[in-house]
Curated annotation (Swiss-Prot):
This is Myoneurin. The modification Phosphoserine is found at S289. SUPFAM superfamilies: beta-beta-alpha zinc fingers (SSF57667), POZ domain (SSF54695). Residues 24-89 form the BTB domain. Pfam families: BTB, zf-C2H2, zf-C2H2_6. Belongs to the krueppel C2H2-type zinc-finger protein family. PROSITE patterns: BTB, ZINC_FINGER_C2H2_1, ZINC_FINGER_C2H2_2. GO terms for molecular function: DNA-binding transcription factor activity, RNA polymerase II-specific; RNA polymerase II cis-regulatory region sequence-specific DNA binding; zinc ion binding. The lineage of its organism: Eukaryota, Metazoa, Chordata, Craniata, Vertebrata.
């Protein structure tokens, strides 16, 4: 049995992996830009990459910027993974150059056809030129078509200037001496529907619509069109878009003046499609129509087509799109790690230099990021935790912590494992889970070479080499490498001893933390490397930590078990924040 959409599904999954940087085994470097991809996919479509990967096992491939531009390669990469290729007069040359250099023959063929179309538009045949000009030779570069409505209701004849050309090159003008009641409508070849924009005459008194066109790109039907003014004094603008006509080369400049002499601002709109003009439903309604048009375009904000997220500036959208495209132009020169944004690289470099510019005024503790200082102050110096859960009234220091906690109540788990279908509330938890499938252990001890799946395991392990024991019993002074062993010590040795008020309060806090950890919080944790004032020992207990055990049929620890065994002794806000730091 053959599934018809299996190939599309496979390509879609591969593209999502590329955008997330998951299982990408090669990096294409073009100047400052880096593109993650899968070498088997590239080699399947490009003879260039096929030849390279037959002779080398290097992960990084450096391309010549003079031969392959970053924008052109990005479009080419999207075509390879999605089968979609959007060509226009702006990008076709870059895409063709990149495809020709990388030997992607299918794209080369498509680009050549498109370039021939554009060349035909720029240099039409003599037959078509003669049909436009008759016996008049056109050598000028631009042609100004001006359409004026004098709007004289008492006169039966209206003089309308249709075409004004350079007088030195000859007159190219036709005048209509009579008004016609019948309106002409022309079909757009793209939609097959009538495309008409009507402007009420009382709004368009003393109005002018200027169409600036390239004379060499002017098709015959445009000259033959006539602007009609009927008895109702409505100005109807109609246009025909030929298949060979580049609509993006047309700029409409509309100037509207009111009867009382108050002029409206000019609206210059560069259309990507002539049909877009007709898609606006009568923007010139009532006397404030000009303001309505301005508001229509001023309210339009950049939006991500993938997630629907709206941004205040186009530059913010461009930075955001790097996440989906896998573009990481900012590279650390010390370790080679790449980032999508400049501030991410700046923060990362501090892990090499040890710089901690944000200092706590109360305890002189330093932090690499400002958000860490804010969290420290709220957690340890009694500052307000402004983010409160509406369900359980638990308060958090950051909005992201509250958002993660809220998923405990809603049950939302947006992150799905594409291998087994298990769902998670946080991306980092999915990352840990995937490592169970792949066996990846990226955190390696510099002393003995032992590898771990999570950074907290490495931190606890490293204390065996350094002898550090940060967890001290306040009753007897014994110290331990992790808080779990400290709790065991208190239970066995000091369970019957007289407790001081401080120790009783601490035990009460620990018991509260235990009860919190017993709640279903298995997928509400995220771990990122950073600095924190909280103890960074997320204890593993013994060496045979569940995270390091292989998964078998008889023993398959759940993500809840794995994560709970990693962290002990912290309240829920601390757990969430620690997960975000690592």
């Amino acid at each position: 049995m053959q599934y018809s959409h299996h190939c599309e599904h496979l390509l879609e999954r591969l593209n999502k992996q590329r955008e997330a940087g998951f299982l990408c085994d090669c990096t294409i470097v073009i100047g400052e830009f880096q593109f993650k991809a899968h070498r088997n996919v590239l080699a399947s479509f490009s003879e260039y990459f096929g030849a390279i990967y037959r002779s080398t096992s290097e992960n990084n491939v450096f391309l010549d910027q003079s031969q392959v531009k970053a924008d052109g390669f990005q479009k080419l990469l999207e075509f390879i993974y999605t089968g979609t290729l959007n060509l226009d007069s702006w990008n076709v040359k870059e895409i063709h150059q990149a495809a020709d250099y990388l030997k992607v023959e299918e794209v080369v063929t498509k680009c050549k056809i498109k370039m021939e179309d554009f060349a035909f538009i720029a240099n039409p045949s003599s037959t078509e030129i003669s049909s436009i000009t008759g016996n008049i030779e056109l050598n000028q570069q631009t042609c100004l078509l001006t359409l004026r409505d004098y709007n004289n209701r008492e006169k039966s004849e209206v003089s309308t200037d249709l075409i004004q050309a350079n007088p030195k090159q000859g007159a190219l003008a036709k005048k209509s001496s009579q008004t016609k009641k019948k309106k002409k409508a022309f079909n757009s070849p793209k939609t097959g529907q009538n495309k008409t924009v009507q402007y009420p005459s009382d709004i368009l008194e003393n109005a002018s619509v200027d169409l600036f066109l390239d004379a060499n790109k002017l098709p015959t039907p445009v000259v033959e069109q006539v602007a009609q003014i009927n008895d109702n004094s409505e100005l109807e603008l109609t246009s025909v878009v030929e298949n060979t006509f580049p609509a993006q080369d047309i700029v409409h400049t509309v100037t509207v003046k009111r009867k009382r002499g108050k002029s409206q601002p000019n609206c210059a709109l560069k259309e990507h499609s002539m049909s877009n003009i007709a898609s606006i439903k009568s923007p010139y309604e009532a006397e404030n129509s000009g303001e309505e048009l301005d508001q229509r375009y001023s309210k339009a904000k950049p939006m991500c087509n993938t997630r629907g997220k709206v941004f205040s500036e186009a530059s913010s959208l461009r930075r955001h799109m790097r996440i989906h495209k896998g573009v990481k132009p900012y590279v650390c020169h010390l370790c080679g790690k790449a980032f999508t944004q400049c501030n991410q690289l700046k923060t990362h470099v501090r892990t090499h230099t040890g710089e901690k510019p944000y200092k706590c005024e109360l305890c002189d503790k330093g932090f690499a990021q400002k958000c860490q200082l804010v969290f420290h102050s709220r957690m340890h110096h009694g500052e307000e935790k402004p983010y409160k859960c509406d369900v359980c009234n638990l308060q958090f220091a950051t909005s992201s912590n509250l958002k993660i906690h809220a998923r405990k109540h809603s049950g939302e788990k947006p992150y799905v494992c594409d291998r087994c279908g298990q769902r998670f509330a946080q991306a980092s938890t999915l990352t840990y889970h995937v490592r169970r499938h792949t066996g990846e252990k990226p955190y390696v001890c510099d002393t003995c070479g032992k590898a771990f799946a999570v950074s907290s395991s490495l931190i606890t392990h490293s204390r065996k080499h350094t002898g550090e024991r940060p967890f001290i019993c306040e009753l007897c002074g014994n110290s331990y490498t992790d808080i779990k062993n400290l709790k065991k010590h208190k239970t066995k040795v000091h369970s019957g001893a007289d407790k001081t008020p401080d120790s009783s309060a601490e035990d009460h806090t620990l018991s509260e933390q235990d009860s919190i950890q017993k709640s279903p919080l298995s997928e509400t944790m995220d771990v990122k490397p950073s600095d924190t004032t909280l103890p960074l020992a997320l204890p593993l207990g013994t060496e045979d930590h569940h995270m390091l055990l292989p998964v078998t049929d008889t023993q398959s620890p759940t993500s809840d078990t794995l994560l709970r065994s990693t962290v002990n002794g912290y309240s829920e806000p601390q757990l969430i924040f620690l997960q975000q730091l690592y």
